[in-house]
Amino acid sequence: MIPPKYQPIWDKAKEKLKQGRPDDLTHAEKVMKTILEYKGNLPIDQDILIPVAIMHDIGHCMILPEYFKYISGGGKLKNGKLAHMLIGAKIAKDILQEVGYDEEKSKEIIEIIALHDADQLEEKRPEFYNTENKRIFHDFDCLDRYNKERIDAYLKAGLFKTKEEMLKILTEKVDDLFIEEIKTQVKKQLKEL
């Protein structure tokens, strides 16, 4: 499933992802698969977006599980996601250097990871999502939230009190998506939930 050129990144990231939130590893796999299988008209730069998909939530491995409720779910604090983004950027930088990944591409990968959930920082949102790769990744990352497995994982982990609470929040977030094609897909998935 993983193209060989990204396998060293995956191998180094996998154990750290397992130490994060309960579904971080599965989420990384799903976002990566969505990017690899995408057949639409968006310009997909796999050399940037696949490493980002693998490592974007890797910073959760440094957050104690009892504090996940402050970064995900109904009890999420405003700007609560900032810690995992900045920690994740450092971990990603180390992994990319260890595997000898292209330096220029690494810079962009690290920058996307450092602010991939910047929609939590609402006043800075336009400034943070200033490249096509950032906007594309944001929407592909969000796309995985709109499925039964992810909702069940969040409910099981206690990140939301009820399915209705989670669906309400997800419905409100549709307008945060940048790409009409993804918005349409998300709206369809919401109707099926």
Please place each PLM-identified region on the residue numbering.
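Active-site metal-coordination segments of metallo-dependent hydrolases
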Residues: L17-K30, G74-I87
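Metal-dependent catalytic cores of enzymes that make or break cyclic nucleotides
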Residues: M62-G80, E123
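Acidic helix/loop microenvironments that form the catalytic cleft of cell-wall polysaccharide enzymes
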Residues: I110-A118
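An active-site-proximal "capping" alpha-helix that borders the catalytic cofactor pocket
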Residues: V31, L36, L82-V99
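Divalent metal-dependent phosphate-bond-processing catalytic cores, especially two-metal-ion Mg2+/Mn2+ enzymes
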Residues: P4-K5, K18-D47, M55, P65-E66, ...
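Active-site alpha-helix of zinc metalloproteases
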Residues: I48-V52, I112
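Catalytic glutamate of the conserved HExxH
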Residues: D57, C61
